[in-house]
């Protein structure tokens, strides 16, 4: 939680199992030190490859907040029901064909992020593009690609897993893998 005007870090909440205590300690220290939420991306935190990634979830939260501070356009769960279905916007799902076939939001066209550059001509210029993926990473990458081609693109905050869990009252407590990819 951060103050909108100053980005001063005010609080944090984490849900999970392993490593939650470490990350809350880091965030509590950052709050005590008066860090801005955008400073979290620059923290140099120790890690061991078998237990964490090179960029800790605390760093990733900082990157997300930094993107917001720089004007990354997002859309949220409460916007989903209000998205125009009249063709005035493009609705894009960047997950794999397999992920899309297991469930998707009506009206969303499936172009996997790895095919986006080759299939960019399938997206009508001049229309805003609302993008979703499984967890948020691929849709973020897709919005950056689309912006590079001159599109006005909006990234869904949360991903289809979040959307599906809320809309269909499903539990999110399960083993998750990166970007919905099976290991």
Where would I find each of the regions flagged by the language model?
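Rhodanese-like catalytic fold shared by cysteine-dependent sulfurtransferases
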Residues: 38-89, 97-128, 134-183
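C-terminal catalytic lobe of FAD-dependent flavoproteins
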Residues: 1-40
């Amino acid at each position: 939680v951060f103050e909108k005007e100053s980005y001063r870090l005010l609080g944090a909440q984490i849900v999970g199992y392993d490593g939650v205590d470490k990350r809350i300690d880091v965030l509590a220290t950052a709050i005590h030190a008066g860090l801005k939420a955008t400073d979290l991306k620059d923290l140099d935190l120790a890690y061991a490859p078998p237990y964490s990634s090179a960029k800790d979830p605390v760093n990733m939260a900082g990157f997300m907040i930094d993107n917001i501070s720089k004007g990354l356009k997002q859309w949220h769960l409460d916007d989903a029901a209000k998205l125009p279905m009249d063709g005035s916007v493009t609705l894009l799902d960047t997950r794999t064909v397999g992920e899309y076939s297991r469930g998707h939001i009506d009206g969303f066209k499936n172009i996997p992020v790895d095919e986006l550059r080759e299939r960019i001509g399938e997206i009508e210029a001049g229309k805003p593009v609302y993008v979703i993926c499984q967890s948020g990473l691929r849709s973020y990458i897709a919005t950056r690609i689309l912006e590079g081609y001159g599109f006005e693109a909006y990234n869904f905050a949360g991903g289809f897993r979040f959307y599906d869990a809320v809309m269909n009252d499903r539990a999110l407590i399960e083993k998750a893998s990166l970007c919905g990819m099976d290991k």
